Swiss-Prot record:
Domain of life: Eukaryota
Record's bilayer topology term: Multi-pass membrane protein
Function: Core subunit of the mitochondrial membrane respiratory chain NADH dehydrogenase (Complex I) which catalyzes electron transfer from NADH through the respiratory chain, using ubiquinone as an electron acceptor. Essential for the catalytic activity and assembly of complex I.
One GO location term (cellular component): mitochondrial inner membrane
UniProt name for this protein: NADH-ubiquinone oxidoreductase chain 4
Keywords: Electron transport, Membrane, Mitochondrion, Mitochondrion inner membrane, NAD, Respiratory chain, Translocase, Transmembrane, Transmembrane helix, Transport, Ubiquinone
Subunit structure comment from the entry: Core subunit of respiratory chain NADH dehydrogenase (Complex I) which is composed of 45 different subunits.
A GO molecular-function annotation: NADH dehydrogenase (ubiquinone) activity
Membrane listed as a keyword: yes
One example of a Gene Ontology biological process annotation: mitochondrial electron transport, NADH to ubiquinone
Taxonomic lineage of the native organism: Eukaryota, Metazoa, Chordata, Craniata, Vertebrata
Family listed: Belongs to the complex I subunit 4 family.
Species this protein is from: Microcebus sambiranensis (Sambirano mouse lemur)
Catalyzed reactions: a ubiquinone + NADH + 5 H(+)(in) = a ubiquinol + NAD(+) + 4 H(+)(out)
Length: 459
C-alpha cells in the first residue's frame, strides 16, 4: 500500500521544486506512472482480500475504486492546464497541491480497515474539495455552493460518528474484517433502526439521495474543471463504497429499513432524469444525470443480492469515467464560448468535428449503449430489482428511456443546428484535449471486453 501512498506524497516536492516551465509535464508524467503502479491490484487473490497491514487492505470492491482515483489525477492535471494559465505561479502550485492532498485522502479512505479511520479520512476529503470550489470556482455563487456542500456533508455524517462510537462500545472492535465475522444479531437491539439510519445517512447525503441532492448541482456548476471531475468520478462513489461496506455489517436491519429508501430512489431517479430534460445549463444537466445514476446504485445496494452488488460496483466505475468525460467536454466548450448555456453552443460540430465525435461517444456511454460497461451495470440492477418486485420494471424502464432522451438532447443542442453569430475566432481542439478524452474512453472500452474485474465482492 505504501508503494502507492509514498509516491503520491513525493508529488509535493515535484511541484514545488520543479522548473517553472516543466511543472505540468513533470506532474502529468509522474502521476501517470503512479496510476500504472496500481495495475497489479486487478489481480485479486482467491480469498478476495489483500491485507497489507493492520491499517490498510484491498479487496475486489476497493481496488477498482482505488484505480479510478489514481487514474483520475493525471487527467485532472491535463484538464486544468488551460484555465490556470492566467493564475500566478504560486496559485498554480497550491491548486496542484490541493489535488494531491485530495488524492492521498481518497487512496487511504478506500483502503482503510478500521471504521473510525475511514470516517476521519472520509471527512478530510471535504477540506481540499471545499478549497478548490471556493477559491478557483468561476462565479461569486461558489461561496454559497461551498456552504451547501460543507453543511450537507457535515450534518449528514455527524450521526455516523455517534453510531460508530456506540458500536465500538458494544462490540469492542470497528475492524471490517472482524465485524464481517461477527455473529451477534444487531437487530435485537431497541435502537437498531436508528443505528442503521445514523450509519447510512452520511452516505445517502454523499451519493446523493433524491431529496438530499441540492448541494450537488450547485457544487458541480461552481467548481473548476478538476473539482467537477473528482466530485463526479470519485467523491460520489465514496457514498456507495461506504454503503456497500456497512449494509453487510448491519444486515438483518437492512431488509426492513430498505423499503422506503428504495421507493424514494426509484421515484427520485425518474424525477431527476425529467429535470435534465428542462435544463439550459450544460454542467447542471450533467450533475442531475449523476443524481439519477446514483439513485440506481442506491437501489442496487439496498437490494442486498449478489447480482445487485455486482451491478452497483460496475455502474459506479462506469459512471465515474463517463461523467468525468462529459464534464471535460463541457469545460472545453466553456473555454471557447465562455458560456455554459447549451443554446449558445449550438452548431459546434462544424467548427470542431473531432470534438463532436467525443461528444457522440460520451453521450452514447451515458445512455448505456449495448457494448459498454454502463449497460452491464444497469441491466444487473434492473434484473435484481425485477426479482425483488415486478413493478420496478416500469420505473427503471421509464428511467432508461428518459436517460436516452436527455443524452441525445444534450448532444443535438451542443453540436447540431445553425451556429450563433457571436461565436468567432474559436480555437481548434488541442492534442491535449483529444488525449484527455481518449484516456477517459480507453478504460471504458477495455472494461467492455473484460467486465469481471470491476464486478466487486460477489462475482
Amino acid at each position: 500500500m505504501l508503494k502507492i501512498i509514498m509516491p503520491t506524497i513525493m508529488l509535493f516536492p515535484v511541484i514545488w521544486y520543479s522548473n517553472n516551465t516543466m511543472i505540468w509535464i513533470n506532474m502529468t508524467s509522474y502521476s501517470l506512472m503512479i496510476s500504472l503502479m496500481t495495475l497489479p491490484l486487478l489481480n485479486q487473490t482467491e480469498n478476495n482480500s489483500n491485507n497489507f497491514s493492520l491499517t490498510f487492505f484491498s479487496d475486489s470492491l476497493s481496488s477498482p475504486l482505488l484505480m479510478l482515483t489514481v487514474w483520475l489525477l493525471p487527467l485532472m492535471i491535463m484538464a486544468s492546464q488551460h484555465h490556470l494559465t492566467k493564475e500566478s505561479l504560486m496559485r498554480k502550485k497550491l491548486y496542484l497541491s490541493m489535488l494531491i492532498f485530495l488524492q492521498m485522502f481518497l487512496i487511504m479512505t478506500f483502503t482503510a480497515t478500521e471504521l473510525i479511520l475511514f470516517y476521519i479520512l472520509f471527512e478530510s476529503t471535504l477540506i481540499p474539495t471545499l478549497i478548490i470550489i471556493t477559491r478557483w470556482g468561476n462565479q461569486t455563487e461558489r461561496l454559497n455552493a461551498g456552504l451547501y456542500f460543507l453543511f450537507y456533508t457535515l450534518i449528514g455524517s455527524l450521526p455516523l460518528l455517534v453510531a460508530l462510537i456506540y458500536v465500538q462500545n458494544s462490540l469492542g472492535s470497528l475492524n471490517y474484517l472482524v465485524m464481517n465475522m461477527w455473529s451477534q444479531d444487531m437487530s435485537g437491539l431497541w435502537s437498531s433502526n436508528l443505528l442503521w439510519l445514523a450509519c447510512i445517512m452520511a452516505f445517502m447525503v454523499k451519493m446523493p439521495l433524491y431529496g438530499l441532492h441540492l448541494w450537488l448541482p450547485k457544487a458541480h456548476v461552481e467548481a473548476p474543471i478538476a473539482g467537477s471531475m473528482v466530485l463526479a468520478a470519485v467523491l460520489l462513489k465514496l457514498g456507495g463504497y461506504g454503503m456497500l461496506r456497512l449494509t453487510m455489517i448491519l444486515n438483518p436491519t437492512t431488509k426492513i429499513m430498505a423499503y422506503p429508501f428504495i421507493m424514494l430512489c426509484l421515484w427520485g431517479m425518474i424525477m431527476t432524469s425529467s429535470i435534465c430534460l428542462r435544463q439550459t445549463d450544460l454542467k447542471s444537466l450533467i450533475a442531475y444525470s449523476s443524481v439519477s445514476h446514483m439513485a440506481l446504485v442506491i437501489v442496487a445496494i439496498l437490494m442486498q443480492t449478489p447480482w445487485s452488488f455486482m451491478g452497483a460496483t460496475a455502474l459506479m466505475i462506469a459512471h465515474g469515467l463517463t461523467s468525468s468525460m462529459l464534464f471535460c467536454l463541457a469545460n472545453s466548450n466553456y473555454e471557447r464560448i465562455h458560456s455554459r448555456t447549451m443554446l449558445l453552443a449550438r452548431g459546434l460540430q462544424a467548427f470542431l468535428p473531432l470534438m463532436a465525435t467525443w461528444w457522440l461517444l460520451a453521450s452514447l456511454t451515458n445512455l448505456a449503449l449495448p457494448p459498454f460497461i454502463n449497460l452491464i451495470g444497469e441491466l444487473f440492477v434492473i434484473m435484481a430489482s425485477f426479482s425483488w418486485s415486478n413493478l420496478t420494471i416500469i420505473m427503471t424502464g421509464f428511467n432508461m428511456l428518459i436517460t436516452a432522451l436527455y443524452s441525445l438532447y444534450m448532444l443535438t443542442m451542443t453540436q447540431r443546428g445553425k451556429f450563433t453569430y457571436h461565436i468567432h475566432n474559436i480555437k481548434p481542439s488541442y492534442t491535449r484535449e483529444n488525449t484527455l478524452m481518449s484516456m477517459h474512453m480507453l478504460p471504458l472500452i477495455m472494461l467492455t471486453f473484460n467486465p469481471k474485474i470491476i464486478m466487486g465482492l460477489t462475482y
